């Protein structure tokens, strides 16, 4: 049991009675700020990847089985969460989504679906589909808010207003669907107050879970070009921990903390270089959590 915050592991143990693992799945989809509907460049921090929709990118059963083989190297778990992670996983024809999500959720080894998407890619028919699936097994929807600062949002090319996020949260929660919000700490130009305001904004909107992600500056991104110009600097580990811990203490106790850092492809990571060793970073964070006596909800 984590003494400092309501961790995802604690939530999974409480909900399913055992440790379950996420299976990261890629449907080969894209985003509206990549395919030209809103923009063609994508978010400023994002590496190029899938760029077109194809319903023939592999059978979902094969994808799940391959992901299970990877996880099997680390655990003997038998139950999993199907995590549709890459790009915008509701940005496709509803009939295709229904087929893929239904096939996944009906598997005996899948206990829940987690669907990462954009709040502007949740038309009523997709929300209705997710609600239908949620009556079978739990469905989580992960929304990439990143920041509640509209000026920063424009800079990172998020391409939607905060009101779109709050509306999506309201519509999903009205159907009993859990919402997870992704927030990036350390975005260019943001102050400590800006980052804390983003966490407060998500909590007030009613998010059930939160992912707190360190900004990674990756070679090959537009963000990297700005970094080379010296227009901003990456957070040090001490700066990151100071902000992270205050975020945790401002979160209500019932919000599940799904992530307190993140992974970046080492071959592309330009900064901060200290984040490359995730195990060491997590050990450092956990040690400091204890030393400082951090407690979620203390300042909520």
Segments from the language model and where they lie:
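Short catalytic/ligand-binding loop motif for oxyanion handling, primarily in non-cytosolic enzymes
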Residues: 32-33, 54-55, 91-92, 265-269
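Hydrophobic faces of well-ordered beta-strands that scaffold small-molecule active sites
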Residues: 21-25, 80-85, 113-115, 139-143, ...
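A structural motif corresponding to the C-terminal end of an alpha-helix
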Residues: 107-110, 168-179, 205, 243-255
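Auxiliary Fe-S-binding modules of radical SAM enzymes
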Residues: 2-12, 17-21, 209, 217-300
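N-terminal [4Fe-4S]-dependent radical SAM core
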Residues: 1-81
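Structural recognition of alpha->loop->beta junctions
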Residues: 43, 104-110, 197-212, 281-296, ...
């Amino acid at each position: 049991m984590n003494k400092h915050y309501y961790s995802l592991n604690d939530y999974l143990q409480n909900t399913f009675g055992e440790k379950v693992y996420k299976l990261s799945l890629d449907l080969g989809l894209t985003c509206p700020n990549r395919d030209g509907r809103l923009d063609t460049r994508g978010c400023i921090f994002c590496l190029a990847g899938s760029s077109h929709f194809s319903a023939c990118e592999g059978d979902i059963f094969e994808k799940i089985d391959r992901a299970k083989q990877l996880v099997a190297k680390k655990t003997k778990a038998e139950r999993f969460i199907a995590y549709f992670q890459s790009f915008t996983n509701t940005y496709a024809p509803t009939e295709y989504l229904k087929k893929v999500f239904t096939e996944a959720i009906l598997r005996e080894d899948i206990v829940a679906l987690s669907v990462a998407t954009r709040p502007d890619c949740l038309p009523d028919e997709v929300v209705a589909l997710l609600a239908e699936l949620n009556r079978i097994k739990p469905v989580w929807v992960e929304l990439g808010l990143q920041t509640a600062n509209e000026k920063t949002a424009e800079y990172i090319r998020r391409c939607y207003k905060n009101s779109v996020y709050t509306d999506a949260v309201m519509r999903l929660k009205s159907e009993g669907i859990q919402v997870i919000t992704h927030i990036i700490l350390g975005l260019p130009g943001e102050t400590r107050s800006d980052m804390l305001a983003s966490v407060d904004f998500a909590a007030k909107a009613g998010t059930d879970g939160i992912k707190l992600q360190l900004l990674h500056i990756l070679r090959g991104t537009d963000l990297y070009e700005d970094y080379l110009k010296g227009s901003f600097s990456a957070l040090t580990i001490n700066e990151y921990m100071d902000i992270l811990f205050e975020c945790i203490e401002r979160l209500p106790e019932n919000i599940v903390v799904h992530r307190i850092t993140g992974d970046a492809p080492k071959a592309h990571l330009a900064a901060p270089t200290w984040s490359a060793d995730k195990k060491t970073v997590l050990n450092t964070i956990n040690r400091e959590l204890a030393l400082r006596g951090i407690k979620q909800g203390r300042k909520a």
